[in-house]
Amino acid sequence: TDQQAEARSYLSEEMIAEFKAAFDMFDADGGGDISVKELGTVMRMLGQTPTKEELDAIIEEVDEDGSGTIDFEEFLVMMVRQMKEDAKGKSEEELAECFRIFDRNMDGYIDAEELAEIFRASGEHVTDEEIESIMKDGDKNNDGRIDFDEFLKMMEGVQ
């Protein structure tokens, strides 16, 4: 399927080989599939930490025929999905750290003055008009300041 081709293109040959080795360890009968019960164990072995709820959701999505087993291609799709989720969570933590640094007075918001300070500190020359424009773009609820959710939305466009 398209999903399977996309999953393979996201991974290096080494990663695919590593995933295959882990998968094969649990494919006891060599039939080319593993049970959903074994799935969590394999994922943890490969450095993923899915919760019970995440595993249930993953299994529901991946085990389309309801057989209770997952083949290697379905497994690859699922691992890539999990890796992307983990990466997203990490970048959100990094953005939270940035937000705390920018929010000089620690009131939970970035105002125009704090935004201007950020640019000045980075050696970037920006006019008051540019600051105003950035504030207007980021301040979705028009309260004159940028909260964390607005900051995340702003940064999505940057990455």
Curated annotation (Swiss-Prot):
Residues annotated as carrying N-acetylthreonine in the record are: T1
Pfam families this protein is in? EF-hand_7
Which positions in this protein are listed as binding Ca(2+) 1? Answer: D27, D29, D33, E38
Q: Record keywords: Acetylation included?
A: yes
Chain sites annotated for binding Ca(2+) 4: D139, N141, D143, R145, E150
Which Gene Ontology BP terms does the record give? skeletal muscle contraction
Alphabetized, the UniProt keywords read: Acetylation, Calcium, Metal-binding, Muscle protein, Repeat
> Which positions are annotated as binding Ca(2+) 2?
D63, D65, S67, T69, E74
Q: Which domain of life is it from?
A: Eukaryota
Which residues are noted in the entry as Ca(2+) 3-binding? D103, N105, D107, Y109, E114
Q: Which residues form the EF-hand domain?
A: 14-49, 50-85, 90-125, 126-159
Note, other = Skeletal muscle troponin C binds four calcium ions.
Q: What does this protein do?
A: Troponin is the central regulatory protein of striated muscle contraction. Tn consists of three components: Tn-I which is the inhibitor of actomyosin ATPase, Tn-T which contains the binding site for tropomyosin and Tn-C. The binding of calcium to Tn-C abolishes the inhibitory action of Tn on actin filaments.
Q: What is this protein called?
A: Troponin C, skeletal muscle
> In which organism is this protein found?
Sus scrofa
